[in-house]
């Protein structure tokens, strides 16, 4: 069965994941088309919308790191230690990017060489999850493998053991060792329920855009190298040795008189307006179908407040949908991690973990401060502070305000006491 699963996974890599990754790094089909004749313009222009869409969306979705916390101090302290030890803010950002490129990604948990819990991310080319056939589709195995010196080697994880395998001299699966978790130490994170890349629905549009831009560049070269047409006089053979190189065409008049001489450039019909319309329409459709805002649009920078939020509404809705999927994955992350004995935590402590996602809107501190001020007396001070993007941690800010108020009160009491003493001294 393992051989069959790996063969199926390799086919998926070839048929789908390679295409998606190539698009992200700017390697599109137009770069691999057959070359045209040497004398014809043959530009290959690539506009990498796939990377722009992925990076722009993830900057909006997770550019502000996810705040993971718990109201129980001992759990909160451990989460902060665990996430800092594993550089989890960066891991989350990379995992989110992987999901946007491929439609899904994986996290793997392990005991590292220092006796601490390790967390790493994998893209779907490096492994796969096997689910059971129940209604809820629970994970049964996680498989990760690589090819080293033409030998495939990897690991299989179930709920208790980790098994090493390789195909040197045939497929061999070795005895398992306990991995220390009460469940499969891996989690699948998904971009959406369909596990589609964020730019997958626009892939054909991006290819069409690249083709249109390349043809437009070819037309520019064509007009720059237009043939000189000379009608009437007969040119000497020595002048026309290399017609294509010199780009000259000579048609001698029928009577050889040379009358009615015409000298101008030959050009094909100009389709510039049609090309521009096509390019502009393709660009609009790419952003419309991906639901990611084109923040480089000239009209985008002039928007503010509610108008800006309307322009980002589609991307905000997309981010909220991904937030729910990411939250599900993070719930499983901490449930599995807390099941390891070295954490000294209860497996159900993950129920006390809370997540705060902050969409990365351009900040207008003046508007935010005015909104917060207008809410005075209507909502709590903590809620007021949450409207100001410059305040990253409302609880910490409330503590600082409390300390400042206490210090101000002490200073006021000291001044009153000092003034009373001075008054008494003056009376004496």
State the predicted function of each range.
Residues 100-101, 106-195:
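Extended, regular secondary-structure scaffolds
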Residues 97, 265-276, 316-323, 374-375:
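Short, charged/polar micro-motifs that form catalytic or ligand-binding hotspots
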Residues 71-74, 83-87, 91, 99, ...:
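Short amphipathic alpha-helical segments
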Residues 175-307:
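Extended, charged amphipathic alpha-helical segments
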Residues 246, 254-256, 281-428:
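C-terminal helix-loop subdomains that flank or include functional centers
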Residues 73-80, 261-264, 312:
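A short, surface-exposed helix-loop junction/capping segment
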Residues 90-91, 98-101, 114-117, 128, ...:
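C-terminal charged interaction modules
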Residues 1-117, 417, 423-428:
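Extended, helix-rich architectural segments
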């Amino acid at each position: 069965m393992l051989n069959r699963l790996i063969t199926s996974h390799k086919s998926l890599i070839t048929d789908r994941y390679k295409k998606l990754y190539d698009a992200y790094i700017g390697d599109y089909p137009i770069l691999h088309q057959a070359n045209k004749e040497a004398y014809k313009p043959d530009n290959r222009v690539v506009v990498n919308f796939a990377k722009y869409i992925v990076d722009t969306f993830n900057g909006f979705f997770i550019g502000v790191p996810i705040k993971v916390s718990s109201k129980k101090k001992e759990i909160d302290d451990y989460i902060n230690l665990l996430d800092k030890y594993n550089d989890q803010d960066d891991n989350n950002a990379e995992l989110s990017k992987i999901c946007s490129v491929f439609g899904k990604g994986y996290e793997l948990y392990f005991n590292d060489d220092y006796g601490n819990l390790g967390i790493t991310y994998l893209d779907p080319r490096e492994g796969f999850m096997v689910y059971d056939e129940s209604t809820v589709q629970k994970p049964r195995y996680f498989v990760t493998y690589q090819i080293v010196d033409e030998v495939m080697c990897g690991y299989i994880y179930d709920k208790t053991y980790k098994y090493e395998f390789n195909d040197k001299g045939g497929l061999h699966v070795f005895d398992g060792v306990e991995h220390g978790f009460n469940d499969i130490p891996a989690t699948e994170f998904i971009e959406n329920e369909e596990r589609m890349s964020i730019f997958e629905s626009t892939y054909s549009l991006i290819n069409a855009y690249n083709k249109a831009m390349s043809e437009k560049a070819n037309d520019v070269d064509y007009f720059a190298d237009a043939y000189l047409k000379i009608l009437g006089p007969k040119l000497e053979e020595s002048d026309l040795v290399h017609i294509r190189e010199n780009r000259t065409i000579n048609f001698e008049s029928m009577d050889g008189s040379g009358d009615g001489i015409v000298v101008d450039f030959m050009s094909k019909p100009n389709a510039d307006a049609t090309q521009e319309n096509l390019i502009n329409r393709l660009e609009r459709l790419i952003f419309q179908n991906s639901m990611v805002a084109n923040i480089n649009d000239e009209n985008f920078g002039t928007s503010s407040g509610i108008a800006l939020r309307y322009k980002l509404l589609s991307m905000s809705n997309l981010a909220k949908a991904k937030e729910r999927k990411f939250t599900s994955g993070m719930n499983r992350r901490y449930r599995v991690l807390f099941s390891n004995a070295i954490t000294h935590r209860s497996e159900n402590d993950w129920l006390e973990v809370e997540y705060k996602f902050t969409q990365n809107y351009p900040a207008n501190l003046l508007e935010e401060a005015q909104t917060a001020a207008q809410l005075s007396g209507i909502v709590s001070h903590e809620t007021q502070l949450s409207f100001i993007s410059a305040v990253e941690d409302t609880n910490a800010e409330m503590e600082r305000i409390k300390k400042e108020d206490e210090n101000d009160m002490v200073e006021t009491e000291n001044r009153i006491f000092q003034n009373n003493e001075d008054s008494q001294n003056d009376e004496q």
